[in-house]
Amino acid sequence: MRSDLLPASGTYADIPIGEVLTEAGASIPETSLRLYAFYDAAEQAAVPTPPEERPIVLIEHALTGDGNAADWWADMVGVGKPIDTAKYLVLCANALGGCAGSTGPSSLHPEGGFWGSRFPGLSIRDLVQAEKQLLDVLEIPRVHVIIGASMGGARTLEWSLLYPEMMDAILPIAVSARASAWQIGIQSAQIRVIEADPLWHGGDYYEAGMGPVWGLGEARRIAHLTYRGELEVDERFGAEPQQGENPLGKFRSPDQRFSVEGYLDRQAMKLRNRFDAGSYVTLTDALNRHDLGRDRGGMNAALGNSTVPTMVCGIDTDILYPYHQQEHLSRNLGTFLGLSQITSPTGHDGFLIEARQMGNVLEKFLVTAEKLAKDPEQRANILQQHHH
């Protein structure tokens, strides 16, 4: 491992990974990924265990996430937390195509100007390929486990099929074997709204200094409803008016809102302030292209051929990736460790909200993964059970 390239614990480094060739045949030259690393000292220890002596946990973030996993998954990642940064070397990189430090549409193009509309379409496999190149640069031949939820879960599954020899076990959370027609439909509706913003300019708005933030906010309103639970949203807001407003007047007026509209307005504003529309379109399109079965004989064959021990986790009220999709993974995975259900009214976002349940699942998974790493025979046995 090139410890000299690792950022100090809790910080990031931008690591050049060279050219990335996409699954569809496009080239992204001079690419770099922003990598966060966490390897703290234990509370009693005077000095931390050096990172090169630790098992590696690779975390994959969701659509609008970034590499700072100790921030967006604060209950899970840290000293003494389920993913213990005093025990593991925890790595998390901003995805290719993102806008939190890695090369994406808002990055400068090597030939001048911004990438913008010149940035190619990406698949989930392309995001994994870029991360593989990152690990190659760091001279990390394998990791202990890979854990990811939502888009991160899609990358986790692709990692296990593209480079099965590089990990002991994986935990994909709240994801499916491929994008469903419903997901593609609602996600492409979000893309259309951004493209309909007059400031989109075909993706080339970076020079203008003003971007399609209206469209991005509207896309987030749609998306956010798919991240929550239907009953939870109704319980919180019902058909109540926004405080001091009247949505039942003589004429409909955009400043006379229902309470839930005010909530979605706040969610839209939060994302507008921290995310780029070009990255939103690129990564949402990558989710539309998610299909483990492509060029592998279909998704059930692809799952059946998986040789990486896999624990699956889902949320009972998930609208975006319904629990039956995790059950489907479980039935078909070649090397299956178990299926855990998080019970929550909050839907897809449950993996971020239900800290106690999520922590239990992670701890159970990491104990199992450690046993597998120590006892290769056990892994062989699991494989045998499934491939008889």
Swiss-Prot record:
GO terms for cellular component: cytoplasm. It comes from the Bacteria. InterPro entries: AB_hydrolase_1, AB_hydrolase_fold, HAT_MetX-like. Pfam families: Abhydrolase_1. One of its GO terms (biological process) is methionine biosynthetic process. Transfers an acetyl group from acetyl-CoA to L-homoserine, forming acetyl-L-homoserine. This is Homoserine O-acetyltransferase. Gene3D superfamilies: alpha/beta hydrolase. It catalyses: L-homoserine + acetyl-CoA = O-acetyl-L-homoserine + CoA. Belongs to the AB hydrolase superfamily. MetX family. The keyword Transferase applies. Pathway: Amino-acid biosynthesis; L-methionine biosynthesis via de novo pathway; O-acetyl-L-homoserine from L-homoserine: step 1/1. It is found in: Cytoplasm. Signal peptide: none annotated. Its main location: cytoplasm. GO terms for molecular function: homoserine O-acetyltransferase activity. Homodimer.
